[in-house]
Regions:
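Beta-rich, aromatic/charged-enriched effector core domains that present basic-aromatic interfaces
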Residues: 75-196, 368-373, 388
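Structural alpha-beta junctions
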Residues: 23-25, 62-66, 112-121, 204
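Residue-level signal for inorganic ion chemistry
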Residues: 21, 92, 135-136, 233, ...
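A structural preference for short, hydrophobic beta-strand core positions in alpha/beta folds
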Residues: 29, 69-72, 119-122
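Short catalytic/ligand-binding loop motif for oxyanion handling, primarily in non-cytosolic enzymes
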Residues: 12, 37-38, 100-103, 128-132, ...
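N-terminal beta-strand-loop-alpha-helix module at the start
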Residues: 1-67, 425, 434-440
Length: 440
């Protein structure tokens, strides 16, 4: 018996653990639902809803192959005990993930147990080096992994019935999830949607990507929007990369596609950083920076995360992010920079709150970017964004801001950009120039 464990590889197509686990004997496919994980650092309902979208399609696709999807509710220690009680000769198949510390700690012990018994098959993910990290060969290794052949479709199995295994079906499990059904404006998960986005991006939407990605007005449609699909594995990075390489020669916007190609490489570079240095989840790259900003001010942080800073452009970005679960990279950087420099709040307090808003939360990328935008790496020069300048540059007529904050409809663009709205809007939370000067 093979047991295939799903985590953030929620797809049937090009899934190494699923392919090999179902190709070499009877397989029990299990998604591990650990409530404590979903309450962990930066995790949230909007992400869980996306994961369940993906699992719903996985369940449908597997059913057509006569393979039921089961849900195990508990942590990995509980799972180990359950496996040993029911399938003590089984082999565990899983893909490797770089995730929050809670996941790493629980799965490391689980993997050691099955590795010692020689009952573990684990497969690489994202081109991450898990042992003997060597930066000199990292790029060539990554390239080699990304160009490996896409795995063939998994085979249809003989109908399987597992009796008395005390696992929930996905259908029964999902019927209990009433809260996430209220989340309606964020991206929808699943393989079908992932491939649709990939195709429209490569054929149409990437035109102008290199320029449009900076604007919250245009980025919503000009960016690939594949980030949550890559984060939750509803499409493999290898599939995205190979489709991109195939599209470039005949494209009328090669420059834009090459720009996207660089970002696929950076994606894995940042995840590798957290894989190699997991302590970065809570500790600054430069240790002396950890006490730089004190314990933090709850009231200030609350106004920031709620989008109640008094700066219309920043507040509009936060309102958009809370609705959609996504905003473009430059605005993410500005939001974090404002919290760390202008408001002088410790990144350890603001980072998880911001992560919870992102449907595409990828811990390795988020944590590295947060530290860079907070000036605690000891490597990168501090970059302090001017919210007022970004407001003018990205939304000159303030129409996008007004679409997010309708109460500003009767104000001029200039007064909105300058955050000079008297008592009719929220009082500004800080003096932008004085706070930036002090931070420098």
């Amino acid at each position: 018996m093979n047991i295939v464990l799903l985590h953030r590889d929620l797809r049937v197509h090009d899934n190494p653990a699923l392919f090999h686990g179902t190709s070499s004997g009877s397989a029990l496919v299990v998604y591990v639902y650990d409530k404590s994980y979903w309450q962990g650092n930066g995790k949230s309902d909007i992400q869980f809803k996306f994961a369940m979208d993906c699992l719903s399609e996985v369940s449908d696709r597997l059913r057509k192959k006569n393979i039921p999807l089961h849900i195990f509710e508990g942590n990995y220690e509980n799972l180990k005990n359950w496996i040993e009680m029911n399938f003590s000769e089984s082999v565990v198949f899983m893909n490797h993930f770089t995730d929050i510390g809670y996941y790493k700690k629980s799965t490391d012990k689980f993997k050691r147990f099955y590795a010692d018994l020689k009952r573990l098959k684990i497969y690489e993910n994202f081109g991450i080096q898990t042992k003997n990290f060597n930066r000199d060969v990292w790029s060539s290794n990554w390239q080699q992994i990304m160009t490996k052949p896409i795995l063939p479709e998994i085979k249809t199995s003989s109908p399987m019935v597992f009796k008395n295994i005390e696992l929930n079906t996905f259908e029964n499990f999902s019927s209990k999830l009433t809260l996430i059904k209220q989340i309606t404006e964020s991206q929808v998960g699943g393989e079908t949607r992932a491939f649709e986005l990939l195709n429209t991006f490569l054929k149409e939407r990437a035109n102008g990507y290199a320029l449009k990605m900076s604007s919250p007005v245009e980025a919503e449609f000009a960016c690939s929007r594949l980030s949550p699909h890559i984060a939750f594995g509803s499409i493999s990075l290898k599939t995205v990369y190979q489709s991109l390489i195939e599209a470039i020669p005949n494209s009328f916007f090669k420059k834009d596609l090459y720009s996207f190609k660089k970002r696929l490489h950076w994606h894995c570079h940042f995840i590798q950083k957290l894989e190699t240095e997991p302590e970065l989840e809570f500790s600054s790259m430069h240790p002396m920076c950890d006490k730089l900003r004190g314990e933090g001010d709850k009231e200030i942080i609350e106004k920031w995360i709620k989008g109640e800073t008094g700066f219309p452009f920043l507040d509009a970005c936060m309102q958009f992010l809370k609705k959609k679960g996504w905003i473009n990279f430059r605005m993410r950087a500005m939001i974090m920079s404002f919290a760390s420099y202008n408001l002088w709040q410790p990144w350890q307090k603001t980072s998880p709150l911001l992560a919870q808003l992102f449907v595409d939360y990828e811990p390795g990328i988020h944590i590295c970017q947060v530290q860079m935008q907070s000036g605690v790496t000891g490597i990168n020069l501090p970059r302090i964004y001017s919210v007022n300048k970004q407001s003018r540059d990205q939304d000159p007529d303030a129409s996008w801001i007004k679409s997010q904050i309708p109460q500003l409809n009767n104000f001029s663009a200039n007064s909105i950009h300058n955050a000079e709205l008297a008592e009719t809007y929220k009082e500004i939370i800080c003096d932008p120039k004085a706070s930036a000067k002090k931070a420098r």
